């Protein structure tokens, strides 16, 4: 078994270990002033759902799904989530809001629930099949899917340094398999801390032949329990290996226990292939974690601090020696179901294990010299294990103990969040540092479904793409219709490189930095490699330092200082001969 921790520490890969790509898919229900599910159609102002990259619908016509593009940091992903919320909330009809809870407090009658009115008839038919098997009430439950990809350079380094005889693709899949195994084993910790679907009305259980859940008692997370969205008891899929996973998925479909591969539900999903069998050739590209409830106290469904916590929790799953077996994963599922149905104000039955994992995370954070804010977040989670009322579910129970009706309480929060979106009606939260003209353009592009590529945020450079057409835009108004756009692109090294890469040209990998502290923190990524440290925009050779054979930390630090003397932003990129 590969000792990833040893390799990371020995070869000073901590900075690279902490880098990843992230994306969020957040489902919600549209509700009325009274807190009931909206009966209106998906707003036409959002354009066609068949291609929209940011705003889709999940199961129901009333259930928008907000999708961030994959981003290189939690901060950037959160900014996109804020921006898409601004667009959706300011585009909804007057008197409509986004429900901040996973389970609607006021569940509509079955005949009032409309499946999403999609162009693709097979997509509609599939949703109607789900209704026949699982009922439409469970389909009305919303949550968050957290997509996670390790830095590909880290995977390559670990592969090379481990001496593995496996191919790079096989090794990458092994890495993600280990993370998936351990997530299933320890997922209960997330349910304890972040679970927030504490109750449901009687009609929610209409497809259950029997249930032992007292409806007058709160739980941590109905959505994550055996009463959540789960497959039938006779559906069994192994996560032991990709081969076993593919074989079992296909068997479930051919025997009729699943109508399609996508019907299989798990709290973690392998991504990188449209069909399970393609994983055998493509390997696992990234993981999708589907466990998370909406946090009603978080304006955008999840606090940014919890996103950071999830990031480093996932890294810890790779850091530890353990690679959970099938038996250990089954234990993890049982612990998760048990945790989900606990009283939110009572300590976890597995408190000792939870505290042990979090203490282990703190040790990892110290070893990799993580930012202090991450350790502070983990310490807050330790406090939540010691004080259950600090968990999301615990906070919900305490809020409702004041006696307010849950439907009215949820509607009040929904109205508060919509008011916040309208507080600065011409700004786009998440991108308020950009020029107002660029913010307005981005708002319209997100609303209509034009794909935005942030070429250079600090220079107000973006591109907009629709099908095969692409426009480069600077300052919100300069496009190909302006003859000066070409020189402006050529003047900006970051934009030039991105456009060249988009068109198939080989360009050196680089990091862009806006502070010396950030550049110095990443020294370990460039140590021992040929690099160039240079200003982002200044030409004439000013402020450039070249290290063909790598730089010592002292020389790297000096080069960073020299580059910042010539420009506000700098690049550190691979040195290429020629």
Language-model segments: which ranges?
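Sequence termini and other peripheral, non-core segments
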Residues: 1-55, 335-436, 440-447, 476
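Terminal catalytic/cofactor-binding subdomain
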Residues: 1-131, 138-142, 178
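Loop-rich catalytic cores of soluble enzymes, especially ATP-dependent carboxylate-amine ligases
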Residues: 9-10, 106, 117-136, 140, ...
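Long, well-ordered alpha-helical scaffolding segments within enzyme catalytic domains
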Residues: 79-93, 158-195, 301-326
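Substrate-recognition/cap regions that form aromatic- and gly/pro-loop-enriched pockets
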Residues: 290-368
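ATP-binding N-terminal substructure of ATP-dependent carboxylate-amine bond-forming enzymes
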Residues: 424-491, 495-498, 517
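Active-site nucleotide/adenylate-binding loops and adjacent lid/helix of ATP-dependent enzymes
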Residues: 475-478, 482-578
